[in-house]
Design a protein with these regions (language model features):
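Charge-rich (acidic/polar
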Residues: 2-5, 12, 16-216
C-alpha cells in the first residue's frame, strides 16, 4: 500500500514536471544574468512560496508570476546596493535616490502582477513576502481585546495593510519586521487613547491562552 502511494506520488510529480517543461517560454524573463547562481536559486525558492500558496506553481501563469516576484527581489537588491555605494560619498543623495526608485518600482511591480493575478491574489503575494504578519497581528489584537469595536478593528487592519505596503520593499526580514513594529506602536497608542488598558488586556489574554492549553 505504502509502496503504491509512493509510486503514484512520484508519477504525479513527474507528470506535473513534464507539463511544466512543455509549457511555452514565459513572457516574463528572469533577470538572472550576471547574478550569483546560488543567490538566484535562493530567490527562486523564496518566491515560489507565493506561487505555491496560490496553487499556480506548475502553470504558465505561475512561471510568469514567479519571475515577476524574483525580479522584484533582484530589483530591491540592486536599489539597496546602489544606495550603499552612493552613501559612502553622499548619504542624503543616496537615501533620496533610493526612496524615489523604490516608489516608482513598487507600483511597477504591482502592475506587473495585475497582468496575471486578481487583487486578492496579489494580497496573498504581499502576505507571503511579509511573513503573514498582517493576519497574525490582526488576529492577535482581536483575541487580546475581545471588546474591540468594529470601527477599531477596521482602523487596525488599515494600518497593518499600510505597513505591509511598505514592508514588501524593505531590504531584509529584519527591516520588514521593523516596519510592522512602528505600526504596532501606532496601534497601541491609538488603543490607549481609546481607553484600553493594554497591560491589563495583555495579562488577561495570557491567562486565557494558558486556560485553553496554548502557549504564549
Amino acid at each position: 500500500m505504502v509502496k503504491n502511494v509512493k509510486m503514484n506520488y512520484s508519477a504525479n510529480v513527474f507528470y506535473l514536471k513534464e507539463i511544466f517543461n512543455s509549457n511555452p517560454e514565459p513572457a516574463v524573463k528572469l533577470d538572472s544574468e550576471g547574478r550569483d547562481p546560488q543567490y538566484v536559486q535562493t530567490i527562486i525558492a523564496r518566491s515560489q512560496k507565493a506561487t505555491d500558496e496560490l496553487g499556480i506553481t506548475w502553470t504558465p501563469i505561475g512561471q510568469n508570476v514567479l519571475n515577476i516576484i524574483c525580479n522584484r527581489y533582484f530589483k530591491l537588491n540592486d536599489i539597496y546596493a546602489e544606495r550603499d555605494s552612493i552613501k559612502k560619498t553622499d548619504k542624503k543623495l543616496a537615501e533620496a535616490q533610493c526612496d524615489s526608485k523604490l516608489y516608482r518600482s513598487h507600483w511597477g511591480f504591482l502592475a506587473d502582477l495585475s497582468m496575471y493575478l486578481k487583487p486578492q491574489e496579489i494580497d496573498k503575494v504581499k502576505d507571503v513576502m511579509t511573513f503573514d504578519v498582517v493576519r497574525v497581528t490582526y488576529e492577535a489584537q482581536c483575541d487580546m481585546i475581545p471588546t474591540l469595536m468594529e470601527s477599531e478593528k477596521q482602523q487596525i487592519m488599515a494600518w497593518l495593510i499600510e505597513a505591509r505596503e511598505l514592508a514588501i520593499d524593505a531590504e531584509s526580514s529584519k527591516k520588514k519586521h521593523e516596519v510592522f513594529g512602528k505600526y504596532k506602536g501606532r496601534i497601541n497608542n491609538y488603543l490607549s487613547k481609546r481607553g484600553y488598558d493594554l497591560t491589563k488586556e495583555r495579562e488577561a489574554w495570557y491567562e486565557r491562552i494558558k486556560a485553553r492549553g496554548g502557549q504564549i
